[in-house]
Amino acid sequence: MAGALENARKEIKRLSLDDTNESQYGQIYSVSGPVVIAENMIGCAMYELVKVGHDNLVGEVIRINGDKATIQVYEETAGVTVGDPVLRTGKPLSVELGPGLMETIYDGIQRPLKAIKDESQSIYIPRGIDVPALSRTVQYDFTPGQLKVGDHITGGDIFGSIYENSLLDDHKILLPPRARGTITSIAEAGSYNVEEPVLEVEFDGKKHKYSMMHTWPVRVPRPVAEKLTADHPLLTGQRVLDSLFPCVQGGTTCIPGAFGCGKTVISQSLSKFSNSDVIIYVGCFTKGTQVMMADGADKSIESIEVGDKVMGKDGMPREVVGLPRGYDDMYKVRQLSSTRRNAKSEGLMDFTVSADHKLILKTKQDVKIATRKIGGNTYTGVTFYVLEKTKTGIELVKAKTKVFGHHIHGQNGAEEKAATFAAGIDSKEYIDWIIEARDYVQVDEIVKTSTTQMINPVHFESGKLGNWLHEHKQNKSLAPQLGYLLGTWAGIGNVKSSAFTMNSKDDVKLATRIMNYSSKLGMTCSSTESGELNVAENEEEFFNNLGAEKDEAGDFTFDEFTDAMDELTINVHGAAASKKNNLLWNALKSLGFRAKSTDIVKSIPQHIAVDDIVVRESLIAGLVDAAGNVETKSNGSIEAVVRTSFRHVARGLVKIAHSLGIESSINIKDTHIDAAGVRQEFACIVNLTGAPLAGVLSKCALARNQTPVVKFTRDPVLFNFDLIKSAKENYYGITLAEETDHQFLLSNMALVHNCGERGNEMAEVLMEFPELFTEISGRKEPIMKRTTLVANTSNMPVAAREASIYTGITLAEYFRDQGKNVSMIADSSSRWAEALREISGRLGEMPADQGFPAYLGAKLASFYERAGKATALGSPDRVGSVSIVAAVSPAGGDFSDPVTTSTLGITQVFWGLDKKLAQRKHFPSINTSVSYSKYTNVLNKYYDSNYPEFPQLRDKIREILSNAEELEQVVQLVGKSALSDSDKITLDVATLIKEDFLQQNGYSSYDAFCPIWKTFDMMRAFISYYDEAQKAIANGAQWSKLAESTSDVKHAVSSAKFFEPSRGQKEGEKEFGDLLTTISERFAEASE
């Protein structure tokens, strides 16, 4: 009966499959960790992609038996139950191939980790999340190829290209391998995302549209036109590998070694320095934002290039090493007044940033003690700010309150405890923190009221005004005096001449200062009352006209009241009252104080903000004397107020004030009729406050404005701000060198954080990898620009690790089809084999050695056979290669491990790592006695045409090392003195080779990367030293004496590694040629 019911149930289900939607579903029959068996799966195919359970977990069919299918699930299966639906997709597990692969970090099934983090706001990958591998929002500039409408096109043909980054500037757009037809339309040059159709072809009367991306099943090798024999070395920059155990572009390499032997170091070296075009390894601002460069000039962020230097907060340059670009939500930073109600500085501090831009913030600690009633009880509470991490891993400042109940401690006790707790809070005045713009919305409003950004003072001094004086045959040291005159002119100068008009009787000392400084600069002055006179006469007669008396010190005393002082105009001329060669007028015109567009506009140019500090202070002092007044507030602080009718003068003044660390703001008064019916003209009122203002006022001429010089520090000026989300735009960022503080100044002196840094969603290794750099054509570039990382996070199930190796090799084949030389680094294939073992165990398959499946060797071979050099499908002709470098981590460094032995049977190069060498800090820790390469003969053609002696030198070095190993065993028995001189030379030269040739310092500029030409020249030097020594011994010399007399030669050979490759091959060949000559000559002299 039970059997009949079961058959009936199956029949009912079978009949219901007539519904097309229902036919897509099966049901879970059993669950065992990542292995799920589903029933009612008739029609599914091997390696078909399925969605398991109500969470749509990604899985892949790996076995079919009747209507049951065994599925390996790539996500955690907790909570999945029998009877849950299984959705068939009808497609194999595939990856997306197209623009956007570079600089991206994926998990084992090509899910972008950063995009998942942004969507889920979690450092973990939520179950069932579905994020496209390639961004659908980023726009790429598509350039069509030579194909046009009507041309026939077939799989692999290139029909366009895009600029991805500065290292991959010709990402070719390919037609998928299985597509073909006649072109009916092709997109014009322009910006498109990866989904928009850019090509339409017709075949057999059917039209198909293609975008810049396509998909490809990971377990199927991409087809090629022809497999070629690899004949070019894969240069790693490591001497021991490039000389003794070379690999080819398109070869297979195995790196077995125990933990701590340096497998990852070699992997990073490959990524940084290898001659591959692409490596597959398993914040920013809106356009137009002005950045302050290291020389004080402003430059649009989109115009900045790698290698440029921007201004750091300490006035020192910061080198640009990367240029992140993208398309994202943007946020406008808008300055507010201290009350946070309205814009404060006329948009001077406004700028726009991308969502992942890091804001550098300061929150003023505000500890308050108050008594309050909560739920009928009285408490004494302490309110304060604290920096803490949220559940999603974001660090932000929060307002906290700690309460002490009166009903528990009594009133006095609660108040005492509150006071003690308040005293124990961190006493720093400000909390410094950094947060991404997109996360600022999570900050509480109460915290925002106390949170500010920083306007950093400019410590750099360009000396531009002094240099300008020098060019005009004046003393550089007079730059502050000229600065004062320029500031005074900006306040009360005539817009059409170098004349100053003073309206107050109090401005006599200002007039004196103008005449005095003009005299020092070789100019003369005249006034409206006294005609053109030289400076000394002018000053004397000027005061005589006032009825002044002169004392012995040369100072004047006169009656305060005089009608003559209602208005005084001083004209400044060139030497001898000439209208030509007027230094002040030339300065006003050429330095930008008079706007070029019209004669009636004054301005203070931007470059003054980076001039010498004394020049900046003198210029503001002149402006305060001319058009300002100084007030002492009730709290004892001093404020200077400057009034001007020129907007550009006000903006320039604020910028210079900010550059000195002086707080400033602009209050705009539009033209209006006041309460008394008087017309008031347009005016900009600039308020200046802060301790550094004392440096300015000490340079004023008028007594009412002067203050004594006091000690002060130039701290950043804080400004309140609001963050407003705006539309998506293209963003432009810059990445600064790793050793810097990652902070630089915008043109408005806002202190900002560089872009391109990775978040905390990766493991430590993945944090380090994006921060590595390589040098390309003299430019320092992040290696992520030519790298795609396929990473398996620690919390990903075992099945995803099994798939990751196929994901990586498929991405590598895609770039090979573009004509690139690709290195795929599998680190480590042992983890992949362990994943294979676990799944095999759950499937109940017969285990082989150490529990690994019997088909381990076949699986490894099917992976490695996808390496090689090949002619790609399609036109134009392209030759590319995929090199596989697999790190293996055998337990305890045992090379008889099944994974190691299976890998060695397939790969052609074996770089064996030695734990003892690693413990001695000998890196790369390659054991030369067990390592080998089967590519040496294949590469002879390359060596013959480039370095003819290379094979002989390599064989000689290996022979010396091999003989020395045998001799070391003899020395342990009989001692070194029992050896012949010839054998002693072999031992000494072998030691020299090990310490100065095989060993490399990865942290030095001279040795981190060794080009093949330097490796070759060093090999010649070492072998020449060996040959000359053996020749001298054969002629009767004693090695002990000879070694002593030629110790300088040995030192020179040992120091050959210190030659900087950046000096170039020609210089290197000359230096090594001189070394070879020296070796021959010194041994010849010593032998005589």
Swiss-Prot record:
Post-translational modification remark: This protein undergoes a protein self splicing that involves a post-translational excision of the VDE intervening region (intein) followed by peptide ligation.
InterPro entries with a match to the protein in the record: ATP-synt_VA_C, ATP-synth_a_Xtn, ATP_synth_asu-like_sf, ATPase_a/bsu_AS, ATPase_F1/V1/A1_a/bsu_N, ATPase_F1/V1/A1_a/bsu_N_sf, ATPase_F1/V1/A1_a/bsu_nucl-bd, ATPase_F1/V1_b/a_C
Q: Where is the DOD-type homing endonuclease domain?
A: 485-662
Detail which positions bind ATP: G257, A258, F259, G260, C261, G262, K263, T264
Q: Which GO terms describe its biological process?
A: ATP metabolic process; intein-mediated protein splicing; intron homing; vacuolar acidification
Keywords recorded for this protein, A-Z? ATP-binding, Autocatalytic cleavage, DNA-binding, Endonuclease, Hydrogen ion transport, Hydrolase, Intron homing, Ion transport, Membrane, Nuclease, Nucleotide-binding, Protein splicing, Translocase, Transport, Vacuole
Q: List the disulfide bonds.
A: none
Q: Which reaction does this chain catalyze?
A: ATP + H2O + 4 H(+)(in) = ADP + phosphate + 5 H(+)(out)
| Record GO terms (molecular function) | ATP binding; DNA binding; endonuclease activity; proton-transporting ATPase activity, rotational mechanism
Where is it predominantly found? membrane
Question: SMART domains from the entry?
Answer: HintN
EC number of this enzyme: 7.1.2.2, 3.1.-.-
Q: Where in the cell is it found?
A: Vacuole membrane
Tell me what topology the record assigns in the membrane: Peripheral membrane protein
Q: Which cellular component terms (GO) are annotated to the entry?
A: fungal-type vacuole membrane; vacuolar proton-transporting V-type ATPase, V1 domain
Q: Which family does it belong to?
A: Belongs to the ATPase alpha/beta chains family.
Subunit structure as annotated in this protein's UniProt entry: V-ATPase is a heteromultimeric enzyme composed of a peripheral catalytic V1 complex (components A to H) attached to an integral membrane V0 proton pore complex (components: a, c, c', c'', d, e, f and VOA1).
Q: What does this protein do?
A: Catalytic subunit of the V1 complex of vacuolar(H+)-ATPase (V-ATPase), a multisubunit enzyme composed of a peripheral complex (V1) that hydrolyzes ATP and a membrane integral complex (V0) that translocates protons. V-ATPase is responsible for acidifying and maintaining the pH of intracellular compartments.
Specify the protein name: V-type proton ATPase catalytic subunit A
